[in-house]
């Protein structure tokens, strides 16, 4: 159960990286409205503030749902993968966002390490047999990982990874969960190199 949850958290962390901020803990800035023309049927990729959310509900599967808004408007699955690998991995240190206009990867190793430490003593609330863990870290885009409309995408995002769940009774994490929500979210300025 912890291995699966770790993979899910890792996948979420990567997805949130796309939403990047310039520094963890920095204040949010309202995105300005703007229009950039797309060329040859491909979406425009202007530099600017992007918001990323990746989430999973009631599953520890390392495949999440992601939505990106702001400088990028796209959506698709986000999969935990190992560096250089193309297959889903329960222990992947990268999160590959497979969006409708291209893909890119987030390095979620740092936020995943913090998340694993935060969940190491589950359930956090023994009396109610529930857990709430929230950690934040900088999540960089893996250099050279962009494809399609995201070829050349770069920068680092401030992300938060949150787990909120209720465990079965008797209270143990080795049993299945009753309800679980895992959310990786953040914002940041993206650039193209």
List the predicted regions and their residue ranges:
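Bacterial N-terminal signal peptides that target proteins for export
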Residues: 1-8
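C-terminal motif of bacterial Sec signal peptides marking the signal peptidase cleavage site
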Residues: 18-20
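Bacterial signal peptide processing site
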Residues: 22-24
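Extracytoplasmic/lumenal low-complexity Ser/Thr/Pro-rich segments of cell-envelope proteins
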Residues: 27-32
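Beta-strand-enriched cores of mature, soluble protein domains
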Residues: 34-193
């Amino acid at each position: 159960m912890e291995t699966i949850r770790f993979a899910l958290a890792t996948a979420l962390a990567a997805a949130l990286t796309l939403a990047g901020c310039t520094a963890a803990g920095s204040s949010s800035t309202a995105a300005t409205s703007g229009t950039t023309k797309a060329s040859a049927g491909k979406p425009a990729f202007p530099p600017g503030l992007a918001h990323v959310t990746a989430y999973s509900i009631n599953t520890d599967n390392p495949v999440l749902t992601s939505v990106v808004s702001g400088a990028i408007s796209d959506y698709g699955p986000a999969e935990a993968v190992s560096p250089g690998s193309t297959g889903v991995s329960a222990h992947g240190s990268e999160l590959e966002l497979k969006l409708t206009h291209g893909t890119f990867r987030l390095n979620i190793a740092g936020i995943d390490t913090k998340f694993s430490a935060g969940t190491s003593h589950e359930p956090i609330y023994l009396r109610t047999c529930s857990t709430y863990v929230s950690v934040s870290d900088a999540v960089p885009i893996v250099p050279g990982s962009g494809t399609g409309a995201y070829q050349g995408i770069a920068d680092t995002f401030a992300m938060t990874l949150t787990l909120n769940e209720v465990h079965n009774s008797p209270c143990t994490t080795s049993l299945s969960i009753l309800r679980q929500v895992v959310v990786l979210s953040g914002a940041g300025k993206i650039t193209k190199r």
